[in-house]
């Protein structure tokens, strides 16, 4: 017992995070989630200090750091760090590394969920600029695939040729976030681009490999570089800075809603198993409300005079 007490007094934040990353709980997460968790833990360590003794981190200290993250990096990032670190401390309590979770009781700020979508013209402007420059071509492919197939940027970044059947013109994908499997047809224009991309870059495994200094690398873009290049293309296209690449999935789903596509059919594309999970991607638009009113009128409701 005395040894355990001494151990708890000297264990550092870095040690706590490393122990969690070696755990079965962490190993069972999807690769994408593990990468995200590692990023948020790294952010916390960089701020609090790798060698900081865990016993010195109390709730007021955690609250101060949370407030700083919210101010400097934004509320969504602060909430991600808080959530992951709370998991780390809960795991450490379970294995006896510490007695407390300083992140469990801090006041969490709420943030407005993004509802922004791109117009078809804005998507077209972005792609036209991206495909004019060889250095931006793969980013253009990633964005076009995300828009056409309604998938997450992370999955499109790491998409391999083995995922696409040129004969059937079908994408077969196991999503990294929830392991959902989807099979999606493609459009003629995207298929033609994929054929051209394979002719030029099929010697390596990725559909949209990283292009650096005019050379094709046999690796995908990372999340940060994709965002940086995406902003460069957006600026070159003269598009508003409120638009983000991650909004492509929401844009695709919103277009399906506007077109009157049923929820089960949307879920077959998005890979969601729960209808509630689709709601954050859905947006109230004049097109969808007009269609709802039209259907109501056709059914004999609404217009009574």
Name each region found by the language model.
Residues 117, 175-179, 270-295:
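Catalytic-site neighborhood detector that most strongly recognizes the C-terminal catalytic loop/helix
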Residues 176-196, 204-232:
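C-terminal catalytic core of Y-nucleophile DNA break-rejoin enzymes
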Residues 55, 97-100, 110-128, 178-188, ...:
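DNA breakage-rejoining catalytic core of tyrosine-based enzymes
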Residues 1-7, 18-32, 39-114, 128-132:
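N-terminal core-binding DNA-recognition domain of tyrosine recombinases/integrases
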């Amino acid at each position: 017992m005395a040894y355990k007490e001494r151990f708890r007094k000297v264990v550092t934040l870095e040690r706590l995070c490393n122990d969690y990353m070696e755990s079965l709980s962490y190993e069972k997460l999807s690769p994408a989630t593990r990468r995200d968790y590692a990023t948020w833990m790294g952010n916390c360590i960089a701020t609090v200090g790798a060698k900081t003794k865990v016993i010195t981190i109390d709730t007021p200290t955690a609250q101060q750091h949370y407030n700083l993250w919210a101010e400097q990096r934004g509320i969504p990032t602060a909430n991600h760090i808080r959530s992951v670190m709370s998991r780390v401390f809960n795991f450490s309590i379970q294995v006896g590394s510490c007695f407390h979770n300083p992140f469990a009781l801090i006041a969490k700020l709420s943030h407005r969920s993004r509802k922004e979508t791109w117009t078809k013209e804005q998507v077209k402007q972005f792609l036209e600029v991206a495909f004019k420059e060889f250095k931006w071509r793969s980013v253009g492919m990633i964005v076009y695939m995300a828009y056409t197939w309604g998938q997450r940027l992370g999955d499109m970044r790491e998409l391999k040729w083995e995922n696409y059947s040129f004969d059937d013109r079908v994408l077969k994908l196991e999503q990294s976030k929830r392991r959902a499997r989807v099979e999606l047809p493609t459009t003629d224009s995207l298929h033609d681009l994929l054929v051209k991309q394979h002719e030029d870059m099929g010697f390596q495994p990725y559909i949209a490999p990283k292009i650096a200094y005019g050379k094709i690398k046999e690796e995908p873009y990372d999340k940060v570089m994709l965002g940086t290049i995406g902003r460069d293309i957006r600026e070159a296209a003269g598009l508003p800075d409120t638009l983000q690449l991650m909004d492509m999935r929401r844009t695709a789903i919103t277009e399906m809603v506007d077109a009157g596509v049923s929820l089960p059919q949307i879920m077959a594309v998005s890979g969601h198993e729960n209808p509630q999970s689709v709601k954050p991607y859905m947006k109230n638009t004049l097109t969808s409300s007009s269609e709802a009113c039209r259907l109501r009128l056709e059914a004999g409701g609404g217009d009574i005079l």
